[in-house]
């Protein structure tokens, strides 16, 4: 029996009571699509008053559900939803509680149902005076036929819609480990047959929120060690572009130098996300800049 929900929105939240209201209000802005959307708020052991903030929404809207679990980081929330088979929508997306959708984004996405994934562009909020429009892929709106082009560094969960079937096929994620959204995205790309790219802004990603994985210092051993592990897996997934771009982040490179560590990869990274001329130039430049810190068989 088909689900009555077109969409499921999973909202992982940890100590984000001051942001989650904006995330929920953005779902109300989906107008007629809001009531066709299942909303799953999963409180990952917050120590703030998140439950009180969302209580009015739970009373007013029957399509919004709230769950509490012990803290296990982002990946544990996705595992929790899958294990308990909570997500019922035809398409499933993850909205971090400090991000939000733009008005009528779901209406735009629904026009392209039928693909394994539908992926949109989004805005990156930096501060009150600066917002950047991020386009995950090169090219125009349409089906992406070359799946190597999907190995984008923009693997944030924002504006990515997984078919229900694909979502439940994905590997379980590691708990208590940063950057599991990268693995979720690239795992999905390994499995998809059809991906539609909507080159329109659908949402806003709050990249600079204090305390998130992006702004946490690279001196944090949990973040640093997690990223070393993630880079190994990105290479196995063929996402060499991710390896080089993030290795070049000043804080990460500084820690590699400080710890005198070398990333040993099983093969040379690929840069297939880029157009061929750029891939050649970028690959050569990055290989030179990281030659002391990334090694692979000749």
From Swiss-Prot:
UniProt keywords, alphabetically: Glycosyltransferase, Transferase
Lineage: superkingdom: Bacteria
Stated family: Belongs to the glycosyltransferase 2 family.
Protein name: Uncharacterized glycosyltransferase MG025
The protein's Enzyme Commission number: 2.4.-.-
UniProt KW Transferase keyword: yes
Database matches in Pfam families: Glycos_transf_2 (PF00535)
Keyword DNA-binding belongs to the record: no
GO molecular function: glycosyltransferase activity; hexosyltransferase activity
């Amino acid at each position: 029996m088909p689900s009555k929900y077109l969409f499921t929105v999973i909202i992982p939240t940890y100590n984000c009571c001051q942001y989650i209201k904006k995330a929920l209000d953005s779902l109300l802005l989906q107008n007629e699509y809001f009531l066709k959307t299942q909303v799953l708020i999963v409180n990952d052991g917050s120590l703030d008053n998140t439950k009180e903030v969302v209580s009015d929404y739970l009373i007013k809207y029957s399509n919004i559900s709230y769950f509490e679990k012990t803290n296990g980081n982002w990946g544990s929330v996705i595992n929790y939803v899958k294990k308990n088979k909570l997500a019922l929508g035809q398409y499933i997306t993850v909205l971090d509680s400090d991000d939000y959708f733009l008005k009528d984004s779901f209406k735009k996405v629904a026009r392209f149902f039928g693909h394994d994934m539908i992926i949109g562009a989004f805005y990156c909020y930096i501060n009150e005076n600066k917002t950047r429009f991020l386009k995950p892929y090169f090219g125009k709106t349409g089906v992406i036929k070359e799946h190597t082009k999907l190995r984008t560094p923009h693997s944030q969960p924002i504006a990515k819609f997984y078919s229900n079937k694909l979502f439940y096929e994905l590997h379980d994620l590691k708990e208590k480990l940063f950057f599991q959204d990268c693995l979720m995205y690239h795992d999905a790309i390994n499995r998809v047959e059809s991906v539609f790219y909507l080159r329109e802004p659908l949402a806003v990603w709050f990249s600079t929120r204090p305390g998130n994985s992006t702004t946490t210092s690279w001196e944090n051993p949990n973040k640093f060690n997690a990223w070393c592990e993630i880079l190994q897996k990105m290479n196995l997934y063929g996402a060499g572009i991710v390896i080089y771009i993030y290795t070049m982040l000043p804080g990460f490179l500084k820690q590699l130098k400080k710890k005198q560590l070398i990333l040993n990869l099983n093969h040379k990274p690929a840069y297939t996300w880029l157009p061929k001329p750029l891939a050649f130039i970028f690959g050569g430049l990055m290989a030179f800049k990281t030659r002391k810190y990334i090694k692979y068989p000749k």
